[in-house]
């Protein structure tokens, strides 16, 4: 029976490249001349710290970062940005976490979405991924289109497609 896995993975090398490109962009921007602003990638915590001297500049830095991530093939929804900014002295900062893996609550939403679609497929939660099996390849492709179209707040990839 044909099957595929739904996963949520981020290539950390691409994230590193995007942060380096964003830092390069920052050096070339005239509105950030002589302004202490930075991007810091923490691969251990899978987060990116963005810091500057005003909250407006932090928002601009986040826009630069999102643009660079998109250029490198990583969706902007992969960043989990907190509502409130940290402030210490003259510096505002935000620690944006990278979403990887499918949490159990999100996996249950995926399975419910698939079952509510009334397609002839089965969905099973397997750790941090969801396996979808069905008799017809067309049904599996319909599930892929359904998930791409649904706004679940996290980017998903499909791998391990088997006939």
From Swiss-Prot:
Keywords: Nucleotide-binding. GO terms for molecular function: nucleotide binding. Pfam families: DUF520. Signal peptide: none annotated. GO terms for cellular component: cytosol. InterPro entries: DUF520, UPF0234-like_C, UPF0234_N, YajQ-like_sf. It comes from the Bacteria. Nucleotide-binding protein. Belongs to the YajQ family. This is Nucleotide-binding protein YE3147. It comes from Yersinia enterocolitica serotype O:8 / biotype 1B (strain NCTC 13174 / 8081). The lineage of its organism: Bacteria, Pseudomonadati, Pseudomonadota, Gammaproteobacteria, Enterobacterales.
